[in-house]
Amino acid sequence: MIAPADPARTESTLIKAITTDLAFRAAEHLTVLRGGDGYRPGSLGFGGMADCHPFRIFEGPNDVLFDQVARDYVGSSEESTLGGLLTEQGMPTVDGPLRELMDRPICTESQRVMVAIGRMIGIVSLWRWALDSPDTFEPDELALVRDVCEEELAGECARLLHRQHSGTRSG
């Protein structure tokens, strides 16, 4: 029998995976914006992508982690909606369109959907960690964390809805 994962370790790994993905995406955007110069080894964007890459190599693909976490959390939860599951994981209250996007039943038949749910759990973990560290962040930094996390959650919800409405079941 396999012992359950340490929740603190799982959360720290999720936060590391989410922040690595965000940093890689930001570096990739900067690289593209710089055009041909962005791909030179000395450029800031290219250096940022290179700095993020080792985590992906040594820790394995983030998608595998997100899928496993989602299956663990969905399997142990009694919540039937995505918003309920994320609230159970400590998501602060959200309103408006984001709340409407999350008021959907949890669909577990697709690996891609489970990866998205795991990623959302990681975003909530990052958000909760920032809120639980008020002495570490200034109020404007906490507001930025909230904005980024809400934007990331909305993007994941939109991708989930698109997959469900387009009938995409690959994964």
Residues covered by each model-derived region:
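Flavin-dependent oxidoreductase catalytic core characteristic
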Residues: M1-G171
